[in-house]
């Protein structure tokens, strides 16, 4: 197979949930129907605009201060590419013939230069317990895998 296989977090999740669906998508370009996520897209854009405001000023967001996150939104010429669907951050392996990537929601930088990859999730629950959610719902495990993939 000479063609480079493009992989993403959603490709991995698709394979884990339905290997056949993944092969149909990647090899034959047959995609399952999808639903629009207009609320998620709106929340995503609001968060990006909010972080961009503080990125331009190179200041910590008030929530960072409130929750003791010693970081500021990372200012980089490629931030819009990294946050763009179908571009995003990428890792290409010519040895294994794959191109892995995904769009991040944001990148923050600590004072020591360390970068924090951010993926914003929203919930309608007033009291959110990550550990309870992680142990109870598979989607939470997918979110954890997503961040682990971006760390890689």
Where are the regions a protein language model picked out?
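Charged, glycine-rich intrinsically disordered N-terminal tails and low-complexity linkers that flank
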Residues: 1-62
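Context-gated lysine
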Residues: 6-9, 14, 26-31, 48, ...
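Short amphipathic alpha-helical segments, especially helix-boundary/capping motifs
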Residues: 1, 24-28, 79-82, 123-128
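Generic detector of short, locally flexible boundary/turn motifs and exposed helical patches
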Residues: 2-3, 13-17, 68-74, 80-86, ...
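Mg2+/Mn2+-dependent nuclease catalytic core
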Residues: 82-152
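Acidic-basic catalytic patches of nuclease active cores, encompassing PD-(D/E)XK
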Residues: 43-88
